[in-house]
Regions:
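Nucleotide-sugar-dependent
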Residues: 197, 241-242, 246-247, 252-277, ...
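Short, polar loop motifs at secondary-structure junctions
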Residues: 146-151, 220-227, 285-289
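Conserved catalytic-core segment of nucleotide-activated headgroup transferases in glycan assembly
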Residues: 20-38, 42-49, 169-175, 180-250
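Membrane-proximal helix-turn-helix segments that form the acceptor-binding/catalytic region
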Residues: 67-79, 91-92, 96-109, 113-115, ...
């Protein structure tokens, strides 16, 4: 297939398990097409932000239609470029995905989680995410992994693996301007309901700082789960595309705790990138890609409860000019190292497209 410019490009077939409100599909597909201006024909399973059992059960007619549509799709992509993110269907062990990828004129498989280590979801015990991942790797012409760790895992099953990290669009973020801390310093955490549980790893540190400094924690999420002992210091804010940026800059620093497991080592540090894009100082667990992102952006790594207390205390006690300098460095670093503009050549190359002249 000869590379074509975006001006000559027929719509790319983009297949994903979630709609634009699903973080992975938004960051790995939708935002790329918005950035490049490439035309796309999107095929998301139900168009929802997740495919959990409750979501699927409430939409059985739409599920049947989605399954039929995906089975037809492989017969209509013979001269098309296809990019498939993660999986096409939660009711698959790779047969649907490999068929679509193998029938495409040029096929790309993209993943940003350790799907090979994810057996937590109820449906994955029947329809294996690992098997879907393996078969998709073998079927695709090019594989895009979201981190070096994920790429190393994929190398066993594909000889055409490249790394494109999760990226941010700088203009989508407000940048913090006021670095003064009032009577109650504020940490901020943003993420999906499924990852809220990771906050429990730093609950003792957060509670200690709540007692010492009256620390508050803003949780920007679609979730409503009980956060146990953290409930007294948490202020929940619903995640929306229209409002998340304004909520981020209200924080004094961002936090990204992660336990160290085979699955979490595949996380692609998107929370850290979002905090940095907002000009926030940041603290994170040096697990998986986090270690490299923290080092490149100048963030602070913390592992033990005592380290979390010490690092967050140090940020609270810094003067406003020092916090502003740290936040400015974060913003500059993320724009330079993790923006869509920085990685567009590699991403377009994976799709066999040359950049616009």
């Amino acid at each position: 297939m000869n590379p074509r410019t975006a001006r000559e490009q027929t719509p790319i077939v983009a297949v994903s398990p979630y709609g634009v409100d699903g973080a992975s599909s938004r960051v790995r597909l939708h935002d790329w097409f918005d950035h490049t201006g490439l035309p796309a024909e999107f095929h998301s399973y139900l168009g929802t932000s997740n495919n959990q059992v409750g979501t699927v059960v409430r939409r059985l007619p739409a599920v049947l239609a989605a399954e039929a549509s995906l089975r037809r799709l492989s017969h209509h992509v013979g001269d098309r470029t296809v990019i498939l993110s993660r999986e096409a269907s939660p009711f698959s062990s790779g047969g649907i995905e490999s068929s679509i990828l193998q029938h495409a004129g040029h096929s790309v498989y993209d993943f940003d989680d350790a799907l090979y280590a994810d057996g937590t979801a109820a449906m994955s015990r029947i329809w294996s995410k690992r098997e879907t991942w393996i078969r998709s790797l073998g079927a695709a012409d090019v594989v895009i992994a979201g981190s070096d760790i994920l790429a190393d895992a994929a190398d066993e099953f594909s000889d055409s693996v490249i790394v494109v990290p999760s990226c941010i669009e700088p203009d989508d973020y407000l940048v913090k301007q006021d670095f003064g801390i009032g009577s109650a310093p504020r940490a901020v955490w943003i993420g999906s309901p499924a990852t809220e549980a990771f906050l429990q790893d730093i609950a003792p540190a957060l509670l200690a700082l709540h007692e010492r400094y009256a620390l508050r924690l803003t949780v920007i999420s679609a979730g409503q789960a009980d956060l146990g002992p953290l409930g007294g210091l948490v202020d929940r804010v619903p995640w929306t595309r229209a409002a998340f940026a304004a909520e981020l800059v209200k924080g004094d620093f961002g936090v990204m705790p992660l336990p160290d497991t085979p699955y979490t080592r595949g996380k692609c540090s998107y929370k850290l990138l979002q905090y940095a894009a907002a000009g926030l100082p940041l603290v994170g667990s040096p697990v998986g890609a986090n270690a490299g992102v923290l080092a490149r952006l100048g963030g602070i790594a913390a592992t033990t409860p005592d380290e979390w207390v010490a690092t967050m205390s140090s940020l609270i006690e810094l003067g406003a000019p020092a916090r502003a300098a740290m936040g400015g460095a974060m913003r500059s670093g993320v724009v330079e190292e993790f923006s869509y503009a920085r990685w567009s050549s590699r991403w377009l190359g994976a799709l066999d497209i040359t950049e616009k002249v």
